[in-house]
């Protein structure tokens, strides 16, 4: 089922709403402010519902937030070096909001806008956003949507997040979902004892400003090798991670691009909650909230 409640009011008087979807195995709360995921509750090893994402209790927290808690980031996530890019022979200038670089498409973020509710059912909700030509500095008008859907097949809680984007000309589109997960439960401490298995043979190195260098490097023999499972805290102080102050890197998904398949498993050491992540994207960013 789905319920709707008021989540707060913006300074211009617009009302923001919170939508909660639940079934026997999972409970999800999302808001039309940024199409943001606010709460995600699943049962721990004792059957207790546990919120496994970080977030705020009210709208004011999200208005002030600059950490992208639960946001859908776009039009282009992560960093664009020099806050500019060239497409079809034309150079486009973006806002430099991370030193000389553009981060998460700049300060005029999709996460600070009210999205329309395009559709909803007992188990899903779709938000949509119209992004005009040259919005954030990107060419082309864009119709964007994100759908959250919950299920409990075989009594296992599941959440799917689906993006659809329809531009009217060539542009950059690289969306990501930016929830911060703590599988022991939000507020329970750090995630250094979370064990992560990541099916990726390569990663993309970054420079001193965390901008990708354009290289694709093997994970073999490095702290980036999660293929056989690794605790996040094992090498968190390694010298190769000091620029980013931890993990904040992109791993290359070498097979199955375009078809959803499991690429990552993470497990909380206290709760017994384990999360499988599947994607049809060619890359996955692992960030330890440095």
Language model regions located:
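An exposed, glycine/acidic-rich loop-and-rim segment of catalytic or binding clefts
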Residues: 1-290
């Amino acid at each position: 089922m789905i319920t709707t409640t008021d989540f707060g009011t913006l300074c211009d008087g617009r009302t923001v709403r919170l939508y909660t979807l639940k079934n026997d195995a999972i409970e999800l709360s999302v808001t039309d402010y940024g199409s943001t995921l606010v709460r995600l509750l699943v049962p721990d090893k004792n059957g207790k519902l546990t919120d496994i994402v970080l977030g705020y209790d009210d709208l004011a927290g999200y208005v002030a937030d600059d950490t992208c808690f639960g946001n859908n980031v776009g039009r282009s996530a992560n960093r664009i070096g020099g806050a500019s890019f060239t497409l079809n022979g034309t150079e486009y200038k973006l806002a430099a909001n991370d030193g000389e670089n553009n981060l998460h498409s700049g300060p005029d973020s999709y996460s600070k806008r009210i999205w329309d509710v395009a559709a909803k059912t007992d188990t899903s909700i779709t938000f949509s956003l119209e992004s005009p030509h040259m919005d954030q500095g990107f060419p082309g008008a864009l119709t964007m949507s994100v759908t959250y859907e919950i299920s409990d097949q075989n009594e296992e809680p599941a959440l799917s997040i689906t993006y659809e984007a329809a531009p009217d000309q060539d542009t950059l589109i690289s969306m990501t979902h930016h929830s911060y997960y703590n599988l022991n439960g939000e507020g329970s401490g750090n995630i250094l004892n979370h064990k992560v298995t990541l099916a990726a043979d390569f990663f993309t190195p970054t420079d001193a400003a965390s901008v990708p260098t354009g290289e694709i490097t093997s994970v073999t023999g490095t702290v980036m090798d999660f293929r056989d499972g690794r605790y996040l805290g094992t090498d968190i102080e390694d010298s190769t991670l000091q620029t980013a102050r931890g993990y904040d890197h992109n791993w290359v998904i070498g097979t199955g691009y375009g078809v959803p398949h499991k690429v990552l498993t993470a497990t909380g050491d206290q709760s017994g909650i384990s999360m499988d992540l599947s994607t049809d994207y060619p890359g996955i960013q692992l960030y330890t909230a440095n």
